Amino acid sequence: MATKYPKFSRDLAQDPTTRRIWYAIATGNDFESHDGITEENLYQKIFATHFGHVAIIFLWASSLLFHVAWQGNFEQWIKDPLHIRPIAHAIWDPHFGEPAIEAFSQGGANYPVNIAYSGVYHWWYTIGMRTNNDLYQGSIFLLLLAALFLFAGWLHLQPKFRPSLTWFKSAEPRLNHHLAGLFGVSSLAWAGHLIHVAIPESRGVHVGWRNFLTTLPHPAGLTPFWMGNWGVYAENADTTGHIFGTSQGAGTAILTFLGGFHPQTESLWLTDMAHHHLAIAVIFIIAGHMYRTNFGIGHSIKEMLNARQFFGIRTEGQFNLPHQGLYDTYNNSLHFQLSIHLAALGTALSLVAQHMYSLPPYAFIAKDFTTQAALYTHHQYIAGFLMVGAFAHAGIFWVRDYDPEQNQGNVLDRVLKHKEAIISHLSWVSLFLGFHTLGLYVHNDVVVAFGTPEKQILIEPVFAQFIQAAHGKLLYGMDTLLSNPDSIAYTAWPNHANVWLPNWLEAINSGTNSLFLTIGPGDFLVHHAIALGLHTTTLICVKGALDARGTKLMPDKKDFGFTFPCDGPGRGGTCQTSSWEQSFYLALFWMLNLLGWVTFYWHWKHLGVWQGNVAQFNENSTYLMGWFRDYLWANSAQLINGYNPYGTNNLSVWAWMFLFGHLVWATGFMFLISWRGYWQELIETLVWAHERTPLANLVRWKDKPVALSIVQGWLVGLAHFTVGYILTYAAFLIASTAGKFG
């Protein structure tokens, strides 16, 4: 008999029911639970998958370059980036009728195409690419790199090339190599690319494979570097009249600190960014030499964490919190490591979302409004998923990897011991935020509905306005720090030399960009709604992780594993109590809820800025009907009009996705609000009917159909809810923005 799926578990492969498929999917990536796995083998498998992961990323980037070079309009777009729509790729669809072909022949193409809202055109243009040939070369290079990484992944699974467990657990050498090699050297290489290729291209000087060794990036060459006279590289910067991509108004500086934006492209100065990457490289290369490896010099992380002395003063550890035993706990738990890495990456990604629109790095991207909206939403959503993943893996750590003996008295032990205080405080703050914010919104809603809008409770966000004023925003007249020319912030070195401050102040006060947008009562309310979402999601995540080992109701929870369906009614109801259901299922709902509020706010606020009509947001965001009517309903009008009696338009694909997204989302509820007996009856009824229907009964199940467990039903529901939610909002966001701004 042929071996059945899954090969990694003999027990599961022999299960005669459809449970086999479900459990195999559920445990496919849980290498720890597979047959015959050893710790060393586990690390080696994960290590090899990293190469595969990088190969997929290179392949994806290669496909973008290839399709734009083949079917896009990169060379035409460069000539007029503000008015020509960038093309992602052609559409080949045999179902298209004449009206659809006409509607989707856009962006200057004479055949149906998709418009690109990813910002790749702006990125490639900024970093010095100018021709389709450049794109093809990049695509082939990445393809070869992907092949190389796939080979490397395979190679590291061969017996002679498998790293040992001790190699995986040497934290200091890994940290040194990642800091100095991965971050430091790659930042240095990127600074090199910007200085040698991108900056000359922005000044109309083409640097290619033929002349890059003979074209000096700076007229003085390396002399100022060797002489220690580095200021020379900042002299003669591009002027405010510089036309990007030409020599008109161009300077010769390569490393500057101009601050603010290039007036024409409305993006950060390339020379500022080169300076930034060089500085990052220096810092990280130094950081990559701090930890003790072969030579017995440098820091030992274990010694630092176990230390009880801080410059001669007796202490429990950093911030007086004891860290004894943390090194081994962290170094021996892949889930602990993954949890912290996901949390760090999730935070970084959210910061990327916030900075990409407020400090746009790519030329002309600030004026491609649909791309700005798509990139913000995309990065915030991914950040949300990563953060929830962080707490899910924290839950697995507490159940599988945490050793109470080894961590006695340290910070993990302390957090676990006073988890009731942490959870109850989060609960209190969530309740406070929820009731007060909703109370204000509902009050305002009622008085507006009764025709007395002057009775609204409108609160100015004075503390946030103070922070904006401290950064130099003059509008509020607060006269503090950078908005006060006599303050120490204004006059301190190096500002007194007027290095970056004039351009920064001009940018923050311009009113046409997204830097420190003017805020009022509507922002105050939605800020607190977002705070409610953040605190509630955090409450669920933290409770799910800290309660993973046990609670008053179920003190032996850890013995059941990370995910268990139910422990029966005998304990007073233990359904929905595993860390899996709390830190993953429930948290995802609140995470999506929160992201809805965040992206609605960002989008509506920016529609006003882009259309030059901020009054609509300011006046109508202070009550609920304003959000429903003037943001959601008003902006979905064009979307609902994607199909009409007059035929198709270029929003019709988004209109269809909008409808389909709602359908998928609503399907989720069927799986979420249900119980197991219902599914078992349904399955058996379907099988009975199937087996008695001509033709259909020629196909038989090999596995006996068994209903989904409650947890599996929820997973199906959650998947539909999430996918439908994202599809619906993505279609709404892109179509409503593109419909207004082309």
Swiss-Prot record:
Its EC number is 1.97.1.12. It comes from the Bacteria. Phylloquinone binds at residue 679. It is an enzyme of class 1 (oxidoreductase). Chlorophyll a B3 binds at residues 670, 678. Keywords: 4Fe-4S, Chlorophyll, Chromophore, Electron transport, Iron, Iron-sulfur, Magnesium, Membrane, Metal-binding, Oxidoreductase, Photosynthesis, Photosystem I, Thylakoid, Transmembrane, Transmembrane helix, Transport. Belongs to the PsaA/PsaB family. The PsaA/B heterodimer binds the P700 chlorophyll special pair and subsequent electron acceptors. PSI consists of a core antenna complex that captures photons, and an electron transfer chain that converts photonic excitation into a charge separation. The cyanobacterial PSI reaction center is composed of one copy each of PsaA,B,C,D,E,F,I,J,K,L,M and X, and forms trimeric complexes. This is Photosystem I P700 chlorophyll a apoprotein A2 2. It comes from Trichormus variabilis (strain ATCC 29413 / PCC 7937). The gene is psaB2.
